[in-house]
A protein has these predicted regions:
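Active-site nucleophilic cysteine motif
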Residues: 42-49, 79-94
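Flexible, glycine- and charge-enriched loops at secondary-structure boundaries
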Residues: 39, 80, 149
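Intrinsically disordered, low-complexity repeat and linker tracts
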Residues: 1-23, 83, 89, 140, ...
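Catalytic cysteine-centered active-site loop
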Residues: 60-72, 77-80, 97-112
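Secondary-structure boundary elements
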Residues: 9-76, 130
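Hydrophobic/aromatic-rich core segments of domains that either
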Residues: 85-163
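Residue-level recognition of well-ordered secondary-structure positions
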Residues: 50, 54, 84, 95, ...
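Short, flexible coil/linker elements and helix-boundary hinge sites characteristic
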Residues: 1, 10, 33-37, 98, ...
Length: 171
């Protein structure tokens, strides 16, 4: 069978399928969740997805073939993940729960923000009167060895995100 087929990056097809199944379990959990006996709204689904992603601990002693791809991250139990990996994982999970989300690469003329990625999520939720695009940076909110995950950078308005990134020391 496919168990012995290895992809170019050295991961077997079986491990890719296993990772996709794990991601689908998360998506099914979110899609089937209820609050006060009602299905979750789009915002509530997104916040739950964000919580799943931010529970991984950032590891900057990265392996470029592991820390950026969803299947590799999930097969390493999140032990190897960097900003692009967080953005990719959030983007894939959001797509599975019906929320538009894309990876966004930060770059500017000074290259101060080069080599950082986050996600752009579009939320339309009548329950909370939300309709717009938001920057989401699960890397900055990720769990750390000394603290739990937080949710400060989960839904930044575009103009607020610009202010925050200008004040960051990313060196």
């Amino acid at each position: 069978g496919y168990n012995n087929i290895v992809l170019q990056d050295g991961m077997s097809i079986k491990r890719v399928i296993d990772a996709n199944e794990r991601l689908q379990v998360w998506a099914d959990t979110i899609n089937n969740a209820t609050f006060n006996s009602s299905p979750l709204s789009p915002l509530e689904k997104y916040l739950l997805a964000y919580k799943y992603v931010t529970r991984f601990i950032y590891n900057d002693a990265e392996n470029k073939t592991v820390s950026r791809r969803v299947s590799s991250i999930l097969n390493s139990n999140g032990n190897n993940i960097v900003c692009l990996g967080y953005a990719a994982l959030l983007s894939e999970l959001c797509k599975k729960i019906g929320i538009p989300c894309a990876i966004q690469y930060l770059d500017d003329a000074t290259e101060k923000y080069a080599r950082h990625a986050n996600a752009m999520v579009y939320l339309k939720d009548e329950k909370y009167h939300i309709n717009g695009a938001y920057i989401s940076d699960p890397c900055f909110d990720s769990k750390q060895p000394t603290r739990a995950s937080k949710h400060i950078h989960g839904m930044l308005k575009l103009n607020d995100a610009e202010k925050i990134y200008k004040n960051l020391n990313m060196d």
